[in-house]
């Protein structure tokens, strides 16, 4: 009964709070956490620098064929916009609008688990209150029923425990991990935006690389530095597997 009150109440409140089309994607959220795409900006930086060197040497048009080989649709779109000689401000605007829409979508995903995390303890407390009321109704001190007071109290309070478990061991960590994954994707795409605009502007590849690396977290910056000291890191798989 305690578990049903907490789970049933929490999920009912979530269903009442969000559109059904968003709730249907909760399974995809779990897939994203467990086996979703890993956004690693280090390899894409190497690809951007390679493209910058090609563009400075042979012109932007030479990148069209290479862009069509890219597996990342966002990166591909950015390079093709540059090849089409679109203004730098327009290129940035288009790509940043796409990132803004993505962030809004991600915030909606995280909000589901934030709400569930806040609802679970509340329904745990409701379950406890219901249990206490029932316990008080059944008390009859004249017949010695006070002996079972401890057991009844424990049963009532365990509902609060279940609510805290759901909030702090399930919904809270899911929300946190989704935020981390979402932040990784945002940084990855910000690197692509700055790289694409830098390629179009004809920035010096070394200067451009420093700029892109500065966007990363310190651990990623150190990884790139260690890769350079060790003779260079892996490059992104830029082309699809040849038949």
Label for each model-derived stretch:
Residues 98-181:
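Helix-termination/interfacial motifs at the ends of transmembrane alpha-helices
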Residues 1-109, 184-243:
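Large intracellular
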